[in-house]
Swiss-Prot record:
Region (Disordered): 1-72
Ranges of biased composition (kind: Basic and acidic residues): 19-34
Job description of the protein: Required for correct translation termination and probably involved in regulation of hypoxic gene expression.
This protein's name: Enhancer of translation termination 1
Main location as per UniProt: nucleus
């Protein structure tokens, strides 16, 4: 059996997000945060509003669509969306607003959090009564959670609201883990594990009530896999990511069994492939630690790698060079588990080389040295 990983970045591995240190998170704000603090000198983006001027929700939907179809590199449109939500809220006095209104409002607040500064670690100190706290990302997340809960009080089975809630709870974990001191980090991570389980339950409920699942909604599942690995590394509890992985793979497989949208299906295939790859990775680590390769471990690693490749190939596109590198890495690892110079090894190294050449043509990176090494083997 040949040497394992040949030097590529393991893009197929679940990336463990860095959990910064700081203080405990603030309590949820009582009111939604005003969007009118954007001091950017950028010109206002061109907007296309295709709804009747008398149709308030239609106007909001149209404005929000401008945001979701934009480059998302500036909060200007988002501020407009939130301002429109505030106006509708005042006009309706909180009554008669549809579930979609609350969904757009909460989702926009979560997106605004991405543009706000993170709450920085500070030592505990007395706060003067005239101190004004700057708007930080955790405040937007808290406001989004409050908004989505308001919507769910009226529409408890609305899938869109439930999907946004799962995303908000996930972002809340990120905020809390980035707002604790080094000393409190482990204890906070332990508390976040229960919230991780809650997110899985909320997503499961959303999936149950949804007529369809979008690729964007599936992002939460991918992020949960990454987050579980990060929490596991903090609390040193080995079953956190495994439990999450099983649940997430089940979500992906259920979507593959029922979803018709091509983009969602491709994303689900990548999700299953990622889950299989993570399992294989842990098995490869065991093989690296052992002086002699255990046949059962090798076969189990092969099984998971083969499954990962099959799912990855079903989601492969000619334009996604970065994913080609991920697939090539998986094929190399699979080829490494066969006898050196065997037909199987040559086959999978050859398939990997094809992807690396294409990725290089697309400008993803330089892989000439890796390609030469694979072709020499």
């Amino acid at each position: 059996m040949a040497k394992r990983p040949l030097g590529l970045n393991k893009a197929n591995k679940s990336k463990k997000k860095k959990l910064d240190s700081a203080e405990k998170a603030e309590k949820a704000v009582a009111k939604e945060i005003s969007p009118e603090n954007d001091e950017s000198a950028e010109p206002a983006p061109a907007l296309t509003l295709d709804a009747d001027e008398e149709d308030d929700m239609g106007q909001l939907e149209s404005l929000y669509k401008n945001w979701t179809s934009s480059e998302r590199d500036s909060p200007r449109i988002l501020h407009g969306v939130v301002h429109e939500c505030d106006s509708l809220l005042q006009k309706a006095k909180g009554e008669g607003l549809p579930a979609r209104f609350h969904e757009i409002y909460a989702a926009s607040l979560l997106d605004l959090a991405e543009f706000a500064d993170k709450k920085k670690p500070v030592k505990k100190k007395k706060v003067k009564s005239d101190d004004v706290a700057p708007e930080t990302s955790d405040m937007f997340v808290d406001a989004a959670l409050e908004r989505v809960e308001t919507g769910l009080e009226q529409y408890p089975e609305d899938a869109g609201l439930l999907f946004v809630k799962s995303r908000a709870l996930k972002q809340d974990i990120d905020e809390k883990m980035s707002a604790v001191s080094k000393e409190e980090r482990k204890e906070t991570a332990k508390k976040m594990i229960s919230q991780l389980n809650k997110i899985l339950e909320v997503f499961k409920l959303a999936q149950k009530h949804a007529s369809t699942v979008t690729p964007a909604q599936l992002d939460v599942v991918e992020e949960l896999i990454e987050l579980s690995g990060a929490l596991e590394s903090v609390v040193k509890q080995s079953d956190i990511s495994e439990t999450t992985l099983v649940a997430c793979e089940k979500f992906y497989n259920e979507i593959l069994a029922s979803e018709k949208d091509e983009n969602t299906v491709k994303k689900a295939h990548r999700g299953v492939g990622t889950c299989k790859m993570i399992v294989a990775d842990s098995l490869l680590d065991l093989l690296d630690d052992d002086d002699e390769d255990n046949d059962d471990t090798v076969e189990l690693a092969k099984k998971n790698l083969k499954a990962a490749i099959e799912h990855f190939q079903k989601s492969e596109t000619d334009e996604d060079g970065e994913f080609m590198v991920t697939l090539a890495e998986t094929m190399i690892q699979y080829g490494n588990l066969f006898e050196t110079e065997s037909d199987d090894q040559k086959k999978w190294y050859g398939e990997a080389v094809k992807r690396l050449r294409q990725a290089q043509r697309l400008g993803v990176g330089k892989y000439d040295e890796m390609i030469l090494e694979l072709e020499d083997d």
